[in-house]
Amino acid sequence: KKEIEIAILQPNIDPYYNKYKKSNEELFELIINQSKDYISQNTKYLILPEGYFDSGLGIDLNFINNSKLKSRIDKFLNQYKNLNLVVGAQSYKIYPESKNPPTNTSNRISDGRWVDIYNSAFQFSNDNESQFYHKSKLVVGVEFMPYKKLLEPIIGEFLLDFGGTIATRGIQNYRTNFNSKENIIVAPIICYESIYGSFVTEYVRNGAQLLVIISNDAWWGDTEGHRQLLSYSKLRAIENRRAIARSANTGISSFIDKNGKIIEKIRYNRNGIIVRNIGLENKITFYAKYGDYIARIALLMFILNVLFLFKNFLIKK
């Protein structure tokens, strides 16, 4: 079984007060300062949390490889032979002028101008173009508004007052894994997506050898929310027999083995970095191949039981 060295960084930046005062370039300098004493030429991955690069609209997908941020990242990665940086970021794509929205999730920014905004994960490497994946399980009211045309005139302003959104994030309809030049395949799973077992198995069926979960659990505060998300991560490890590297902005960042055991973590509301050798897996579990078969069998038995009781009721009647 192949093992690789992975570093997980927990920046612990308060999103309510501090995060949005810094540019993406300034946020990247924090990464360099915090990680330089921990990563080496043996480190294959440096993992950062969801939405770390979130300044302004985020990363312009049309010019991602020609940005100041990308140049700074390349300069950093060139110091390490095989290092890959996986990080969460807000990203966007602006479309040419059009009377009608070019996609179902496009938001109008001016007359005839449209933009899609994404909650994305990126992989930056020193020998490949950037790879990205857009979060596809969105949080209602925070990342998208259902029945937007109907509800926006009624509750739009009310929702904004409580930190929600009347905009809609873009998604993608397939699970994209990140591949390195050493053919290491990792699954980029963003926050809320980790609670869906069958959703995560799509990455594994597409070849993922390791699950990477990035999250920004600072919004929860010190409640049960961030602990529950961590518990879901352990289930995903067991179901797929894949180790997990989990980076959360304020915690709990952790390494989880394929049996669902937390082998190292950074406590909530702490700044830190942890480094471990983690095993890669290629075998597909029965659950990953066939999905939540127990629930389907239970549902079938329930339906048959209801039909049986209904039949007996009719006979007695």
Give a label for each model feature.
Residues 1-317:
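Enzyme catalytic cores with a strong preference for nitrogen-chemistry domains
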